[in-house]
């Protein structure tokens, strides 16, 4: 795979620190992709960013509770057309709700509802969590996934995003069933990966470079 994407310098990217997420590894990955990166814990710091990354590891209900102070700032940024990139739990938080909150006894935790849909648990006999490398099958064009069709990325998750509109699915992966690995809204500026690009070697670096280039072009 060609990983020589430029990652245009000058794109200002903020990584949202809401208490859950691989902040350092995500930041290092973005720096390798030539971004100017800051980790921010203040919602007001999102205002001047070219792009926003919402990372996340853990339970949906906890994520939404911790990220509560950022809800309005994230929604405003998305409405303004600025790029918002959710990673793993961060991607799931872009949706409307999750079965996980119900299973954890947290009730109906509300997501950001930037991509209508619900996160659901794997069914059948597959081992959960889905952990390890798996293949990406791109289903529609989006700047984030240029050059990664058929490549492998690293996953760790028990739930996955199920958008109401199948047109919001950008790439799929097979783990006993086909599930969305990358999703995006209609406008294309809000998107997420179920896998961890910062842990996905050359494939992940290509995706992060695609993201930085997209932010620089806006």
From Swiss-Prot:
One Gene Ontology term of the molecular function aspect: lyase activity
InterPro entries xref list: Class_I_gatase-like, GATASE, Imidazole-glycPsynth_HisH
A GO BP entry: L-histidine biosynthetic process
EC number in record: 4.3.2.10, 3.5.1.2
Catalytic machinery residues: 88, 196, 198
Membrane-traversing stretches: none
Reactions catalysed according to its record: 5-[(5-phospho-1-deoxy-D-ribulos-1-ylimino)methylamino]-1-(5-phospho-beta-D-ribosyl)imidazole-4-carboxamide + L-glutamine = D-erythro-1-(imidazol-4-yl)glycerol 3-phosphate + 5-amino-1-(5-phospho-beta-D-ribosyl)imidazole-4-carboxamide + L-glutamate + H(+); L-glutamine + H2O = L-glutamate + NH4(+)
Keywords per UniProt: Amino-acid biosynthesis, Cytoplasm, Glutamine amidotransferase, Histidine biosynthesis, Hydrolase, Lyase
Pfam family name, one: GATase
Domain Glutamine amidotransferase type-1: residue ranges: 12-218
Broad class of the protein's primary localization: cytoplasm
Disulfide bonds: none
GO CC terms in record: cytoplasm
Pathway(s) annotated for this protein in UniProt: Amino-acid biosynthesis; L-histidine biosynthesis; L-histidine from 5-phospho-alpha-D-ribose 1-diphosphate: step 5/9
Protein's cellular compartments: Cytoplasm
PANTHER family associated with the record: IMIDAZOLE GLYCEROL PHOSPHATE SYNTHASE SUBUNIT HISH
Subunit comment: Heterodimer of HisH and HisF.
Described function: IGPS catalyzes the conversion of PRFAR and glutamine to IGP, AICAR and glutamate. The HisH subunit catalyzes the hydrolysis of glutamine to glutamate and ammonia as part of the synthesis of IGP and AICAR. The resulting ammonia molecule is channeled to the active site of HisF.
Name of protein: Imidazole glycerol phosphate synthase subunit HisH
UniProt organism field: Halobacterium salinarum (strain ATCC 700922 / JCM 11081 / NRC-1)
Gene field: hisH
